[in-house]
A protein has these predicted regions:
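Charged, compositionally biased N-terminal leader segments and the immediate start
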Residues: 1-33
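Loop/helix-junction capping segments adjacent to catalytic residues or to phosphate/diphosphate-binding pockets
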Residues: 3, 140-141
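A broad structural signal for alpha-helix termini and local helix breaks/kinks
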Residues: 17, 29, 58, 151-154
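Long amphipathic alpha-helical segments
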Residues: 21-57
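Amphipathic interaction/junction segments at domain boundaries or subunit interfaces
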Residues: 47-139
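Short terminal or interdomain "cap/linker" segment that borders an active site or interface and mediates
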Residues: 113-132, 137-139, 152, 156-181
Length: 181
C-alpha cells in the first residue's frame, strides 16, 4: 500500500473524527510505532487493519468508511499532483486519464514495486462512464468514493447507474456525471 494513502487516511480520521479517535484506531490496529510516510510502500494489511479499527471505533460500515475516505482524499491528492493535471480538464477528462496520468506516471514510475489498482475508464456515451476497478485488494468502494471526490472537485455530481462485482478483485461501476445544480 502506498504511503500517500495511509498518510491521508490519518488526516481524514483526524479531520472527521478527531485526534483521539485516530490515536485509538492506530492503537487498535497495532500500528502505534509506524509513521506512514507518503513516499514509502507498506504492507497492504496496514490499511485494512486501520479501516477495521476505524469501523470498530465509529460503528460505521467498512464500505461507507472507504467511500467517504475516497471522496475526501481527492482534493489533497489533486493539489499534490497538480502539475500533472491539465487545468482545462473536467471530471470526465480526469477520470478518463487517471490510469495513464496518475497510476502509470506518478505511482508506478516513481515506485516500480508499487501495485496500485488498475482503473480502466471508458465513456459509454457523453458523460456516462464505465469505471472498472481491478485489484487484489478489496477497495473498490474507495475507488467509487474517489469518483465522487473528483466530481465534487470539479463542481459536478455523480449518479450511480450500475454497480456489479464481476469476479474476485474486479468491480464495475457505470456513472453519469452532471454539473452540480
Amino acid at each position: 500500500m502506498h504511503g500517500v494513502i495511509l498518510a491521508h487516511l490519518r488526516h481524514f480520521v483526524t479531520d472527521r473524527y478527531g485526534q483521539s479517535v485516530w490515536d485509538d484506531v492506530n492503537h487498535r490496529a497495532g500500528l502505534t510505532d509506524c509513521l506512514h510516510v507518503p513516499i514509502q510502500l507498506y504492507p497492504d494489511n496496514h490499511l485494512e487493519d486501520l479501516v477495521t479499527a476505524l469501523q470498530s471505533v465509529t460503528g460505521l460500515h467498512r464500505d461507507d468508511l472507504l467511500e467517504e475516505f475516497g471522496a475526501w482524499v481527492i482534493p489533497p491528492l489533486i493539489n499534490m499532483y497538480r502539475a500533472m493535471i491539465p487545468r482545462e480538464w473536467d471530471a470526465v477528462a480526469f477520470l478518463l486519464n487517471v490510469e495513464e496520468r496518475i497510476h502509470q506516471r506518478v505511482i508506478r514510475l516513481k515506485n516500480p514495486e508499487a501495485t496500485p489498482p488498475r482503473i480502466d475508464v471508458r465513456e459509454l456515451e457523453p458523460r456516462v462512464l464505465q469505471v472498472e476497478y481491478r485489484s487484489h485488494r478489496d477497495l473498490s468502494l474507495l475507488a467509487l468514493g474517489c469518483v465522487h471526490g473528483v466530481a465534487a472537485f470539479y463542481g459536478e455530481k455523480v449518479e450511480i447507474l450500475e454497480s456489479e462485482q464481476v469476479d474476485g478483485g474486479v468491480r464495475r461501476f457505470v456513472v453519469r456525471l452532471e454539473p452540480a445544480a
